[in-house]
Amino acid sequence: QEIDKLFEDNIKIAVMSGDYVQRGEPSLINKFEKTKIALSQGIDIVIELPAFYSAQSAEIFAKGSVNLLNKLSCSYIVFGSESNDLDKLKRIATISLTKEFELSLREFLAEGFSYPTAFSKALFDEKLGSNDILALEYLRAINTINSKIEAYCIKREKTGYYDDEKDNFSSATYIRKILLDCNKK
């Protein structure tokens, strides 16, 4: 609905993971059902992101997605974001592509920090939600390949990645936790 407000007459393409998602986990919904859902919600074309990209980090997922959209000569990319602050995310994306940032990131990784924590520390403890991190990776990918794709972000109003239920919506992590708990019984 938000995308329709921004681009009512454009073709909407969704690049989605297939049967395997980040961390190589099987998707809770098979790719055909996900496609049906996307089409029923106003998407015009669904493209499966190859598992090589979809089963890896946000950085690799974003690179694969942006490369696909760029090859299709898409004009825009729209993504969800907790902060909904595109200017801030663009600034961070630019900083994160510098040699100084890379050195700082490597130092924190060498100290044993997880990638998200090391990334945050390298940015002077800038706190980013999981959707902001993916948004940042889309922006980095656009910059890296020098794409003309224009980015837009939409505020994530519902739950965050690790949140429990809120207003009848649950995060992906919470849904996986419920399913795992059910399987243990």
Model regions and ranges:
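N-terminal catalytic cores of NTP/NDP-binding nucleotidyl/phosphoryl-transfer enzymes
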Residues: 1-34
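Glycine/small-residue-rich interface belts in oligomeric ring/scaffold proteins
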Residues: 22-46, 52-61
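Active-site cores that bind ATP or allylic diphosphates and position pyrophosphate for catalysis
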Residues: 49-185
